[in-house]
Design a protein with these regions (language model features):
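Core alpha-helical transmembrane segments of integral membrane proteins
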Residues: 179, 183, 187-202, 210-221, ...
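Long, compositionally biased intrinsically disordered regions
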Residues: 373-618
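Glycine-rich hexapeptide-repeat left-handed beta-helix
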Residues: 6-10, 14-24, 30-53, 57-69, ...
Length: 618
């Protein structure tokens, strides 16, 4: 911003001749090289500071106008250099506007008493009628939000986190609304109590109230036609367009909300895509997608998730209120018309078909199909391991990360086989083997928590789980051998026990517990330090993964340590398992091609990509 000086008497006369008026000309200050001839029909109230008008401003591709202020009412406003502000139907009141901005054909831009800009807003996700388990603020990421939700019942920890966030917000809170540099706001009705950072564009929005748009040179924010946003924060690279309505929401980096989607008290992180449908009290972690008008995401925690059309969740038992919730772990899907009765927990990479009752808990049976057939509920464990859909998903997600390197606040680990998911597979394999042992082999079906597992599906589930285990062990060992041919045992015990998925961050539970203790003991003194702890864990992921996997390999093969001879055996098992996996996926693709409506070129290209998998064996 400039150092401003008082107007000269000559400048005042020029302004008056251009039909400008001021409540008090002595309260109007300007930049040193200010040119009054670029202001027309402007009314000035209170303290107003105005920059220079030296450049042209591009208002549309190939169409430029000179910077200036025309047809506007300003009160208590500071304006940077080379802005074009024109046709303000109502007024601009209590705002600071940066350099190189274009503001045109809008009604009101105002900061009122008590403005929060969406910062510090407490929202209740999962439990729709809860007390507010996530605090919205500019530095929020998926890990911190998931951490808050998970530990909300720990009052001491909750209070520590709230105090750190309050301090962070207080240190950054401006005295009035701000518009950054290179911002474009056109054809928009009302903006009240908002911070709009650099390189944002608001085009045709209906109303923005108590919001922060976190644009930057590396990721601009775009707000489009008909959008209403209240008490919300929208992060770098996000777009909210085509009559979307959001209230009490956080929209994370590179998220896209479009086509009349509506959401309240929900959070969306890292490349999530929402169109047409609705969300309420939803925790949408990285790569959550819903495309259909008839889909409702309510009371659920999701990540790497795809909602089929007419997906619905029931969070209300019509007794104590809409307080029930569920978790669909990473990679889950719901088919068209799927319905899930909360509370429920689905293991990683599960797929739901039909109206699923009995509050399923399949965390320890991941990669499952859950199928409702009338009143009967079926569970097909491990089925999703060998599908075309899974193969395409795990290949596409890394390619679809649209975030700039500078704007990756949420940590996203793309490993589909990790100590977290493989830990579930190990438990699932034991569950299936135990069911077979207890019930015997001479039965047509098994029962697991009121879900029917057909006998053939149980046997295949054990087989598919074992394929996944061998693929995982071989892949990790192959990576270790490249940097350490001697296969040195892990230098740490961190990671050898249970793991968790904190909305994209795969981490040992022990490290999460260490963060909890450090927060309570005051060893983490700022939000930035807390975020850095999550980043440190992610940096050490391969080290912790090796500690867990080394122990797992020894347990699986019944060996005290891994020798080079063992490594050769594990690699052979890896190649066999991987080829079996690819063969099963190829069968799945052939079944779909046989339906008759898949173009042969598409099928052949997919099969060719499978055939190339042999290149990654060594």
């Amino acid at each position: 911003m400039n150092d401003y000086r008082p107007l000269t008497s000559e400048e005042i006369e020029v302004l008056k001749s251009n039909d400008c008026w001021a409540e008090d000309w002595t309260s109007v200050n300007v930049a040193e090289d200010f040119k009054p001839n670029f202001m027309h029909r402007v009314m000035l109230y209170g303290e107003v500071n105005i920059g220079a008008f030296n450049k042209n401003v591009e208002v549309s591709q190939g169409f430029v106008k000179h910077a200036g202020i025309n047809n506007a009412t300003l009160r208590n406003v500071t304006i940077g250099d080379d802005c074009l502000i024109e046709n303000v139907g109502n007024y601009v009141n209590n705002y600071t506007i940066g350099d190189d901005c274009y503001i045109s054909n809008r009604s009101t831009l105002e900061t009122t008493e008590g403005a929060t800009y969406g910062e510090g807003n407490r929202v209740s996700v999962l439990n729709e009628v809860g007390e507010g388990n996530v605090i919205l603020f500019s530095d929020l990421n998926s890990q911190l939000a998931a951490f808050m939700v998970k530990h909300f019942s720990d009052k001491e920890l909750k209070e520590k986190i709230r105090q750190l966030i309050k301090t962070d917000i207080d240190n950054k809170m401006p005295e009035r609304g701000q518009i950054g540099n290179n911002v474009k706001i056109v054809n928009t009705k009302e903006i009240t109590n908002c911070i709009i950072n650099d390189f944002c564009e608001v085009n045709g929005a209906a109303r923005l109230s108590d919001c922060t748009l976190l644009g930057s040179a590396h990721g601009n924010v775009y707000i489009g036609t008909g959008v209403i946003a209240e008490n919300s924060i929208i992060a770098e690279g996000a777009s909210v367009i085509n009559s979307v309505k959001i209230q009490d929401c956080y929209v994370g980096e590179a998220c896209q909300l479009s086509n009349g989607f509506t959401a309240s008290t929900s959070v969306f992180f890292a490349n999530s895509y929402m169109s047409n449908g609705e969300a309420c009290a939803a925790f949408c972690g990285p790569f959550t997608a819903s495309h259909h008008k008839s889909s409702l995401l309510i009371g659920g925690m999701f990540s790497f998730y795809n909602a089929g059309s007419a997906t619905n969740f029931s969070n209300h038992a019509y007794k104590m209120g809409p307080m029930h919730w569920g978790i669909l772990e990473r990679g889950s899907k719901t088919a068209s018309g799927a319905y899930l009765l909360m509370p429920a927990t689905l293991g990683s990479f599960s797929v739901c078909f039909g109206k699923l009752m009995h509050h399923p808990n399949t965390r320890n049976l991941p990669f499952a199909y859950l199928i409702a057939d009338g009143d009967k509920m079926f569970l097909i464990p491990g089925r999703n391991i060998t599908t075309v859909g899974l193969y395409r998903d795990i290949k596409k997600w890394p390619k679809r990360d649209l975030r700039a390197q500078e704007n990756r606040k949420s940590i996203v680990n793309f490993d589909w086989l990790s100590p977290f998911s493989v830990g579930e597979i190990l438990k699932g394999k034991k569950i299936l083997e135990s069911l077979r042992e207890v019930t015997g082999d001479n039965v047509s079906q098994y029962l697991y928590h009121e879900y029917i597992i057909p006998a053939s599906s149980l046997h295949k589930g054990i087989k598919y789980y074992d394929i996944a285990l061998r693929i995982y062990m071989g892949a990790v060992l192959k990576r270790v051998l490249k940097r350490d041919p001697a296969i040195t045992p892990p230098a740490t015990q961190v990671g050898t026990s249970d793991w968790d998925d904190l909305s994209g961050l795969l981490l040992p539970v022990s490290e999460e517990e260490r963060i909890v203790n450090d927060l309570k003991e005051g060893n983490i003194e700022s939000i930035q330090q807390l975020i850095e702890r999550f980043e440190e864990i992610d940096t050490n992921y391969r080290q912790y993964q090796w500690a867990w996997t080394y122990k797992m390999i020894c347990d699986y093969y019944g060996i005290p340590e891994i020798t080079l001879e063992d490594a050769n055996r594990i690699h052979e098992d890896y190649i066999k398992a991987r080829r079996s996996w690819i063969a099963e996926i190829k069968k799945d693709a052939e079944k779909e091609f046989a339906m008759g409506d898949v173009e042969e070129e598409v099928f052949r290209n997919f099969v060719n990509s499978l055939n190339q998998e042999v290149d990654y064996e060594n």
